Amino acid sequence: METLSQDSLLECQICFNYYSPRRRPKLLDCKHTCCSVCLQQMRTSQKDVRCPWCRGITKLPPGFSVAQLPDDPEVLAVIAIPHASEHTPVFIKLPSNGCYMLPLPISKERALLPGDMGCRLLPGSQQKSVTVVTVPAEQRPLQGGAPQEAVEEEPDRRGVAKSSTWSGVCTVILVACVLVFLLGIVLHNMSCISKRFTVISCG
């Protein structure tokens, strides 16, 4: 099998969707991998699954579903979260500069796939990619409190918000001045047009 980048290992090369509990990475007899949804669609009219790349056939016994094909262990190794403990804390950096910890239970029998736990917390059908960070025990927050570094950075964040507001006010004032200047030029030209038949120059 050809060497793929780590990004391409995370997604099905047919539909380009990331692997998830609904789209498990299934290994064919020819050692190619694609998601269970694509394999199910390819199998709708056939008893066997034909590989879309090498045309190799993976025979499925009667009553055997695509879900029963083995998962690709290489792909699971790339997308699996390390089993440090029963509950590995996950820190998610949000656009609002907040950092929240989600304790995710990890089953040792199966790997945690993207979208398995964290994405269920999002409203609607939104999906966000999150980066799982292993945090040393000495840097973990105590009893759900914020880490010490986050507490120290809080005054800096307020300063950034104040400077951002101030720069916005300055931008509005600058735009208003430019508009007044342009309005002055237009009014001056209009007064010159009304006096064009006189001898006085509007220079």
Swiss-Prot record:
Enzyme class name: transferase
Listed pathway(s): Protein modification; protein ubiquitination
GO cellular component: lysosomal membrane; lysosome; organelle membrane
The entry's keywords: Apoptosis, Lysosome, Membrane, Metal-binding, Transferase, Transmembrane, Transmembrane helix, Ubl conjugation, Ubl conjugation pathway, Zinc, Zinc-finger
Domain of life: Eukaryota
Membrane topology: Single-pass membrane protein
Zinc finger RING-type: from-to: 12-55
Localization per record: Lysosome membrane
Post-translational modification: Ubiquitinated. Autoubiquitinated in vitro, leading to its degradation by the proteasome.
Catalytic reactions of this protein: S-ubiquitinyl-[E2 ubiquitin-conjugating enzyme]-L-cysteine + [acceptor protein]-L-lysine = [E2 ubiquitin-conjugating enzyme]-L-cysteine + N(6)-ubiquitinyl-[acceptor protein]-L-lysine
Ranges annotated as spanning the membrane: 167-187
Main location: membrane
EC number: 2.3.2.27
Gene Ontology terms, MF aspect: small GTPase binding; ubiquitin protein ligase activity; ubiquitin-protein transferase activity; zinc ion binding
Residues covered by region (Necessary for interaction with RRAGA): 106-165
GO BP terms, alphabetized: apoptotic process; cellular response to amino acid starvation; negative regulation of TORC1 signaling; positive regulation of autophagy; protein K48-linked ubiquitination; protein K63-linked ubiquitination; protein monoubiquitination
PROSITE patterns to which the protein is assigned, alphabetical: ZF_RING_2
UniProt function note: E3 ubiquitin-protein ligase that acts as a negative regulator of mTORC1 signaling by mediating ubiquitination of RagA/RRAGA and RHEB. Catalyzes 'Lys-63'-linked polyubiquitination of RagA/RRAGA in response to amino acid starvation, thereby regulating mTORC1 signaling. Also mediates monoubiquitination of RHEB, promoting its association with the TSC-TBC complex and subsequent inhibition. Also mediates 'Lys-48'-linked polyubiquitination of target proteins and their subsequent targeting to the proteasome for degradation. Induces apoptosis when overexpressed.
Database matches in PANTHER family: E3 UBIQUITIN-PROTEIN LIGASE RNF152, TRIPARTITE MOTIF-CONTAINING PROTEIN 2-LIKE PROTEIN
Self-association and partners: Interacts with RRAGA (inactive GDP-bound form); stimulated by amino acid starvation.
Family, as annotated: Belongs to the RNF152 family.
Name of the protein described by the UniProt record: E3 ubiquitin-protein ligase RNF152
